[in-house]
Amino acid sequence: MNKGIITLILTLLPVISLSAESYNILDFGAKAGKEYLNTDKIQAAIDKCSSEGGGYVVIPRGEFVSGTLELKSGVMLQLEHGARLQGSSRKEDYTKHLIRALDAEDIGICGHGVIDGSGYSFWYVKENGLYEHDRPVPGYMIYLENCKRIRVTGVRMSNPEAWTLHLLGCSDVTIRDITIRNPLHGPTNDGIDIQACQDVTISGCDIYTSDDAIVLKNRHPKYNMRPCKNITVTGCILTSVCNCFKIGTETIGQFRNIVFSNSTVRFAQPTDSLARIRVNETKRPLRASSGISIESVDGSLIDGVVISNITMEEVKCPIFIRLANRGDGVQKVKPTVPGKIKNVLITNVNVRNAWFASSITAIPGSYVENVTLSNINVTMRKMIDAKLVDRVVDEKVDAYPDANMWGNLPATSFYFRHVDDIACNMIRCEIDGEDNRPAMIFDDAKDIIVNGLILDENYIGDAAVRLTDTHCARFSNCDIKDGLKFHYDLRGELNSDIRLIDTDPAKVRSEKSCSVEQSVSFVIK
């Protein structure tokens, strides 16, 4: 089939779709207004639409209150401009979730209206303006399980009872140009949760929420053999006080071929109407815990992650990659061996005003493998603390993985432990004031390449890079702003095969347990 025919088919598809039959909920007795419950009326329109071959169920301008609605095969729920589907504030009006679908095909939600879950109706104030659930909630706002060919486009979603949009075991999914606006004090208000799904594209979405903005996971025993793969997230704006893009925490099964690109991670302003928590006397912004988190702690394989062209503002931790062994969150049973994280590429990332160093870590006996960081520019917050430089970082083998689990690390910008095959190319690190910590720390590391590590004059400590028990490392083209070469701090008894290319041997610092002469070779070009 030639390109011209393919283009013609793609051009005609929207026309064919738009010519499908429409079913206006007003024709089924639905009434706008807070005093009317329209669950049965809207469901009748959905049932008829599906039974007659599919089409659009139209929600016109106005506010329509409803309990649980079940989407069925062939049905596209269309919210016209000015339409609001309002979740009921009464638990008894729900079976489970506001909108749900099970084993359906060719379904979706589209238009320019609003879906509101009435989450406040199921919360109570806990402390410091935060909320908790005070009774059983209806479930997720939108829940789609084992469905195929799903399209969610254009709509605005807000105030879910728990997660906003949850897809479990689905395939061929397009989520495009949706807006999510959730209060930052809401409990477990994830934006989009992709669980054990395949062939998913999320693009052009603007998400503002209290919990994970976009998260890939799998914690469901029914789908633990179904990999989460071929997932693309691109062109999105993500604002969260938790994690903005995350793989984890619940990770059973496999995660393959994941792409996150061309997106912005933002911070919430204390003046925002939805940001009513954790605003201290200095009125500092509400930062995301992490911009990017990749976690395997329940025995899963994460293989093939590409992250590119990301801008982050005011995050606590820019990049958090964690391989550990806590046991999955369902059975509470540890796998016999930890999972694996390998083949990760992170390139063209710009970070402004981060709090904590990025970390890539595993646990003793396991390694995060084949990670490339390229063209990373990071501006960090200063932290002068003599004790912090030599701080011992706990392993926390079975702890809940969190980007802030260690707080301030002994490195300013990047902390690597239990890693194998790491490449860092053109890494620029700046600090907003003087700091005496190394920029990078490698501990129990193998096959390391650092080409082009650039630091500013605010690094005032004894070493730019610390190596502990590191084997086969290559450093080249490393400079600070005034053109001086780096000091390297070698610790431990197992450092070997370390080459400092075009580096003055006099500017290598060694602990007594490590012999510079035996461990390091110098290549002057």
Name each model feature, range by range:
Residues 18-525:
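Extracellular/periplasmic carbohydrate-active domains that bind, remodel
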Residues 1-5:
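Positively charged n-region of N-terminal signal peptides that target proteins for export
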Residues 7-17:
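Bacterial N-terminal signal peptides
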